[in-house]
Amino acid sequence: MDNIDKTMKFDYEEIPKDNVETVLNNVHRTLEERGYNAVNQIVGYLLSGDPAYIPRQNDARNQIRHIDRDVIMEELVSNYLKENKK
């Protein structure tokens, strides 16, 4: 049986949710301290993968680069849906 006929499972190393939260809070705070629109900058980073959207101040750029963007997006969507469940 060819590998093309098999279903692939997406699996990634589990990153503690509190770590993602801590990093995003630090990035958000840092962006606001620098006078940027934090949401726009984070979205720019998530869509493009370009770390230039995140400042180096407070080690924010280094921290966010250590978390896969898919993991960050998953966490953001999950939290949004929990908070806005009707």
Curated annotation (Swiss-Prot):
HAMAP family: UPF0297
Protein name: UPF0297 protein SH1302
Family of the protein in this entry: Belongs to the UPF0297 family.
Disulphide bridges: none
Entries under InterPro entries matching the protein: IreB (IPR009309)
